[in-house]
A protein has these predicted regions:
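Hydrolase active-site cap/lid region
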Residues: 1-25, 81
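Active-site nucleophile elbow and catalytic-triad environment of alpha/beta-hydrolase enzymes
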Residues: 25-41
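Short, conserved loop/helix-junction motifs that constitute active-site signature segments
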Residues: 44-45, 72-74
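Short beta-strand/loop motif that positions the catalytic acidic residue
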Residues: 45, 51-53, 57
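Short alpha-helix in the alpha/beta-hydrolase fold that links the catalytic acid
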Residues: 47, 61-70, 79
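Acidic catalytic loop of the alpha/beta-hydrolase fold
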Residues: 55-60, 88
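Histidine-bearing beta->alpha loop at or near hydrolase active sites
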Residues: 79-101
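Short, hydrophobic alpha-helical segments
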Residues: 102-113
């Protein structure tokens, strides 16, 4: 529910629209959304993972990305926040990091920067 309260863009705003019309249904909405919220399952992630966050993301607010990262169960995890980036979360700047990550974890080799 954090993203819904922090974000005023669609698709999250559609849930806010619904709750404005039916505030009494908030508990049911929260219960249903828990089935779809990745944060609820983050502790199950045990494989190596990289997470990139756009600090100006108005679709998935950075606060939710940090919360997700904190809850990830994997010991081998890396966080890459990108200032000045929105929902694309530094995709073009991040591609070299992704390439090195997959080379290391899928191909078993290190790639120099």
């Amino acid at each position: 529910m954090d993203a819904i309260e922090l974000t005023h863009t669609y698709p999250y705003e559609e849930i806010n629209d619904y709750l404005r019309l039916h505030p009494d249904r908030r508990p049911e909405v929260e219960e249903t959304l828990a089935y779809f919220d990745g944060i609820s399952f983050a502790d199950r992630i045990s494989c190596p993972i990289i997470v990139n966050i756009g600090l100006q993301d108005n679709v998935c607010p950075p606060e939710t990305g940090y919360e997700l990262f904190d809850r990830i169960g994997a010991k081998d995890k890396q966080l890459y926040p990108y200032d000045g980036h929105g929902h694309e979360a530094g995709r073009f700047r991040h591609s070299a990091i992704v390439d090195r990550f997959f080379a290391r974890h899928l191909l078993g080799r290190e790639v120099s920067e």
